[in-house]
Swiss-Prot record:
It comes from Staphylococcus carnosus (strain TM300). It is found in: Cytoplasm. This is Galactose-1-phosphate uridylyltransferase. HAMAP family: GalP_UDP_trans. Pathway: Carbohydrate metabolism; galactose metabolism. GO terms for biological process: galactose metabolic process. It holds the Pfam family GalP_UDP_transf. It comes from the Bacteria. Belongs to the galactose-1-phosphate uridylyltransferase type 2 family. Keywords: Carbohydrate metabolism, Cytoplasm, Galactose metabolism, Nucleotidyltransferase, Transferase. Its EC number is 2.7.7.12.
Length: 498
């Protein structure tokens, strides 16, 4: 296999412009490219193979396809990603260079620093904009405001061959998980993602070392992760509230939140302490305050219950220390709070703790105040609700049965990719196609048929909006104090204990 001279030159130019190389590194880079692609030499002919003014990523994808065509690479996701990240690492500065440049730009303005880093991560295809663009995205109007609905199609699914290889592969404990620092520059394997082009910015939160990185398959603009350098499990504590507030003080254009630290109500990774951040206005940000209240011991902190399907207390203030203390007071009170009448129990008889919070911090540019939202969570199960009392109930599992994590708590649904095909079947079914197979959605589809007069013009939109209403139900199921009179009285009773 020979590589096209124009593409090699273009790639080398990008490595010199964007990476850590100079013009004298020309032949060195050329030989690295030949080694990574397993090519024998370079074709000096002028044929550009149809790519006009290609990006480095487009050239990398072209070479990967060439390798597949020549039997030099197996057509499985992890092997293609290893080659891709090795190539695109060449156009990426070293971690030390990025860290130096990031903090130099930060002195001028925090947005310049994150903007610089984000451009690098998009250019080297660590942030996969092309994949993210495949996601289905729309809004549904509800009594709580517009909920944001996404069907996640960006992450490539492993095929049977790759799953079998992963099962047979020797399990490695390095890197320990997908969120530890050791992933920076890691070559990848059948069981662990290729991260050769991955970079992490180092930062301190409360004098402890943390890392800041962007998320490859983002759920919203500049979706990023702040991860502890220490290998420690997810933990909600006083330090968490302080860290989140300190992060938004450093980066006021980003929000910062943490998943809860208990199963069922937590995120998918509980083994490594991390927060999620980014530049996005979530539906919950607009939630109106239903009832304001004061806690005497924290005179400078305003508090309010939000009109939201989940049970949220919003704290507002300018003194970060006092806000941290107020948040910790609410958290500690909630951890031991029980209301049998509402099925709310802090501990099982065997001493298992059930209560925690999902905290979200932001700096409100309009009021120049810090805000800290505490979403009350309870992870009990029961005979009636074996998956969780305050978790999506069985009748909505056909749309969503996974944990309700931080992003969804804020009103942005991350629905499974399977729904794209399944909803097309539902659409065919409601339009009267006798060969349609609505599967687990049949009961729901029949209800919609009774409610609406479907035609080719309105079917897709009606189905999408009904999915949005099911997501509203999912959030209501997950709320501990329900929107009923009894539920809201229960919420006020809890507030009085503060």
């Amino acid at each position: 296999m020979n590589l096209n001279r124009q593409y090699v030159n273009r790639f080398i130019d990008d490595a010199i412009q964007y990476g850590d190389y100079e013009r004298e590194d020309n032949y060195y880079l050329q030989n690295l490219i030949l080694e990574i692609t397993k090519a024998e030499s370079i074709d000096e002919t002028k044929n550009n193979n149809g790519l006009v003014n290609p990006t480095s990523n487009e050239i990398a994808q072209f070479w990967i396809q060439q390798m597949l065509n020549n039997g030099l690479l197996e057509d499985v996701v992890y092997q293609k990603e290893i080659v891709e990240t090795k190539l695109l690492d060449l156009i990426t500065p070293k971690p030390s260079t990025i860290n130096r440049e990031f903090w130099k730009r930060y002195e001028s303005h925090p947005e310049k620093a994150t903007g610089y880093f984000y451009q690098i991560c998009k250019r080297n295809h660590y942030v996969k904009e092309d994949a993210i663009a495949k996601n289905i995205h729309y809004y549904t109007e509800t009594e709580y405001g517009d909920l944001e609905i996404t069907i996640n199609l960006s992450k490539p699914e492993k095929d049977a061959k790759e799953i079998a290889k992963a099962r047979e592969a020797k399990q490695s404990s390095y890197p320990a998980n997908a969120l530890c620092m050791e992933n920076e520059g890691f070559v990848g394997s059948v069981t662990q993602a290729a991260r050769r082009n991955h970079r992490i910015v180092r930062l301190n939160l409360n004098h402890q070392p943390w890392g800041f990185q962007f998320s490859p398959y983002a759920y919203f603009p500049e979706h990023s992760i702040v991860l502890s350098e220490a290998h420690e499990p997810m933990k909600i504590e006083k330090q968490t509230f302080s860290n989140l507030l300190q992060f938004v003080q450093k980066f006021p254009h980003y929000f910062a939140g943490s998943n809860a630290d208990l199963p069922i109500v937590g995120g998918s990774i509980l083994s490594h302490n991390h927060y999620q951040t980014g530049r996005h206005t979530f539906p919950m940000d607009h939630a109106p305050e239903m009832k304001q209240f004061k806690m005497e011991q924290f005179p400078d902190v305003q508090a309010a219950i939000l009109k939201w399907p989940m049970s949220v207390i919003r704290l507002k203030g300018e003194d970060l220390d006092e806000m941290t203390e107020a948040a910790d007071h609410i958290f500690e009170t909630w951890k031991s709070y029980t209301d049998e009448k509402l099925d709310i129990r802090a501990y099982s008889q065997d001493g298992t703790r059930h209560h925690t919070v999902t905290p979200i911090a932001r700096f409100n540019q309009t009021t120049s105040e810090y805000e800290l939202d505490l979403v009350l969570r309870d992870n009990q199960t029961s005979t009636q609700y074996p998956d969780g009392i305050f978790h999506p109930h069985n009748d909505v599992h056909h749309i969503k049965k996974e944990n309700i994590g931080l992003i969804e708590v804020m009103g942005t649904a991350i629905l499974p990719g399977r729904l794209k095909k399944e909803l097309l079947e539902v659409e065919r079914y409601v339009l009267g196609d006798i060969n349609a197979e609505p599967g687990s959605h049949k009961k729901w589809a029949d209800k919609m048929k009774e409610k609406y007069n479907f035609n080719n013009e309105n079917a897709k939109n009606i189905i999408h909006q009904e999915v949005g209403r099911i997501f509203k139900r999912v959030l209501e199921d997950s709320g501990v104090f329900k929107q009923s009179t009894e539920g809201q009285k229960g919420f006020e009773k809890f507030i009085q204990t503060l």
